[in-house]
Design a protein with these regions (language model features):
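Nuclease-adjacent, charged terminal/linker segments that flank catalytic cores
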Residues: 1-108, 112-115, 121, 125, ...
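Electrostatic, structured charged patches in enzyme active sites and in nucleic-acid/phosphate-binding
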Residues: 110-358
Length: 358
């Protein structure tokens, strides 16, 4: 966005222009999302949207699909009009796309809104979101690829290809996603799911020994509700993550990136002191399938040589502890530190009691 003179344009304020620009940037936003980006009160946002719509600066349509789980009425979404884009351009905003360029099919709207919701949740924690248009253009990807965009973490050292999955996931869709992941340049992947069934479908497909996805970085599979919270304090935000680990009564001795010895075969997050023992600490709250894959090869002879157990941070949610124990049942030198997932919610201080599978 170019520097522009701060002034009123007709009956529109600078805040109104900025709101229109956010609609341009995100392509489509729900009423609740507009309240967030515009810092508007619950009731005032309706008044503001009605005002801008009556002036012809934006369009609204009903959301169809499964954007809001288990709810028949999905609400409305808004997008900027050609008149709105023209107004932004006249006032110094760098806007190259037309309203038709920004338009998204009704089928894809729930996916876009979900990605925007995740991006808005993570922005204050230092994450940066790039939508699918920008990613496909920058990395010369296929226009038909179904990745929703990318997320650059707070540490600025990982860029995740983002995939959004709803309650019903078809086998063909999973095969297509896996093909994209193997073909594209991203070494890190984040898949968010809605509902327990879709989570288990992704895990089963991605852990299939005949067609396993292997990347040099991370492949994280998380329920959407949990991802919005946990990623703000995960290892992708090192300072917050270390503080969270310390709150669990764990003393960090060394991070893997600064490890003094290359002998260990464990790719751990930290070397820690726990219950009077030195242990390799691995945070599996992120369900990183690459961490799990590597951990499966920390064999008995490696443990006997190193003399260190692995301390795995997990939770008592079904998408954590049971899954981890099932996959790692043959690795006997693991201590599981299971916490209530609401501890993550409390520490992150983002949302209260909600279904983390949503």
């Amino acid at each position: 966005m170019n520097t522009r003179e701060k002034r009123y344009v007709g009956e529109l304020s600078i805040q109104d222009l900025e709101l229109l620009y956010q609609l341009y940037k995100y392509r489509a936003l729900s009423t609740a999302q507009i309240a967030v980006v515009g810092n508007l009160g619950k009731w005032y946002v309706y008044k503001k949207l009605r005002y801008l719509k009556n002036l012809g600066y934006l369009y609204s349509e009903q959301i169809t699909g499964n954007y809001i789980p288990n709810q028949r009425r999905q609400g409305s979404y808004f997008r900027i009009s050609g008149k709105g884009i023209t107004l932004l351009r006249k006032n110094g905003y760098s806007v190259d796309s037309t309203a038709d360029d920004l338009k998204v099919t009704r089928y894809r709207i729930p996916y876009l809104l979900t990605a925007n919701e995740l991006a808005l949740s993570l922005t204050n924690a230092g994450w940066k979101y790039k939508d699918s248009r920008e990613i496909k253009k920058s990395y010369d990807l296929n226009k038909t690829d179904i990745l929703q965009g990318s997320l650059i973490n707070s540490n600025k050292d990982k860029e995740y290809a983002l995939y959004i999955l709803f309650k019903k996931v078809y086998r063909d869709t999973l095969s297509r996603i896996k093909s994209e992941i193997n073909r594209n340049r991203f070494e890190n992947v984040l898949l968010t799911t809605r509902g327990e069934l879709s989570f288990r479908s992704v895990i089963k497909s991605f852990m299939n020994s005949d067609d396993r996805v292997i990347k040099g970085g991370s492949v994280k599979v998380l329920p959407f509700g949990f991802a919005k919270i946990y990623l703000t304090i995960s290892s992708d935000n090192k300072q917050m993550h270390q503080s969270f680990i310390n709150k669990q009564g764990i003393k960090i001795l060394e991070s893997y990136s600064n490890k003094s010895s290359s002998e260990s075969k464990v790719v751990y997050d930290y070397l820690v002191s726990h219950n009077g023992e030195e242990k390799y600490f691995i945070d599996l709250l992120d369900n990183d399938l690459m961490k799990i894959h590597d951990l499966k090869y920390y064999r008995k002879e490696d443990y006997e040589r190193d003399g260190r157990k692995v301390l795995v941070l997990t939770s008592n949610a079904d998408f954590h502890l049971n899954f981890h124990k099932q996959i790692l049942d043959h690795v006997h030198h693991i201590d599981y530190l299971s916490i209530d997932p609401k501890q993550v919610v409390t520490y992150a201080n983002l949302i209260s009691d909600k279904s983390l599978f949503e």
